[in-house]
């Protein structure tokens, strides 16, 4: 099993004087792929960019959106598969896309998308779909197709060759939103100011999670155990998460309590934030994972490289 760091192209220079052996590249769209090979770290995974170029300009990556967006996504994916195959890159990780849950069923959209994925030639590269959490800005009319283990299991039945990337932080975020979703959906339908209601949802979730820390801790731990009982992921994104601080700051992702160093206990954007995930639970359940990627957001609140080193030592000490 390999342990990698996740880096955008802009952050690669930060790792020049480190001894990390492997990295997963988070692509932005316009980089020279071959330049990613010119590093001391070995490139072992590509994370598909969040944007894609279409004949009408940039658009968000969404394999489920029919027409030119999906066509552009598959063209880019085929380019990445060829590059990965030719250069010994083992994994490509993608976010599958979104659907309008008021107009379509998840099953119908996944079945349509799976037909096209089943025609892909992956050239010996493992293509993995990542769990993407539902949240106030990613729900209902624009809901991720693959948010939890049930969704991933369904897609694997339709597309047997597909691999899975489990993002621990995303699992926690989706677990919290899932607890409130039914009640929010009933109110959302009749809400005229939906932007305002997104803020209300966030405020209500923060209030309840802070008042019921033990409940949500147990809930997330249970979902982690359930995930590993149903799927052994091919790769894992190891990320800290504070479910008491899932809050957009100045309207920008990541959430304050998202994408934290493992075991973090300190200030983030002028608030005290604590990683509330018991990472020993998932680390002890790994059986077939080939890659663990350390992922944390580059913030001024902590020493990014030092946190990466500490996280690397922590995970190394606990992997089976």
What do these predicted ranges mean?
Residues 27-44, 76-86, 110-119, 148-158, ...:
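Short amphipathic alpha-helices and their capping/turn segments at secondary-structure boundaries
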Residues 7-36, 52-56, 62-64, 68-73, ...:
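Acidic-and-aromatic substrate-binding clefts and catalytic sites of carbohydrate-active enzymes
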Residues 1-86, 162, 198-211, 309-320:
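N-terminal pre-domain/capping segments
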Residues 289-320:
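Hydrophobic, glycine-enriched assembly/anchoring segments
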Residues 57, 62-166, 172-174, 179:
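Active-site acidic/histidine proton-transfer and metal-coordination neighborhood
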Residues 28, 68-72, 116-119, 151-155, ...:
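Glycine-rich loops and low-complexity Gly/Arg-rich segments
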Residues 2-7, 21-25, 42-49, 92-94, ...:
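Hydrophobic faces of well-ordered beta-strands that scaffold small-molecule active sites
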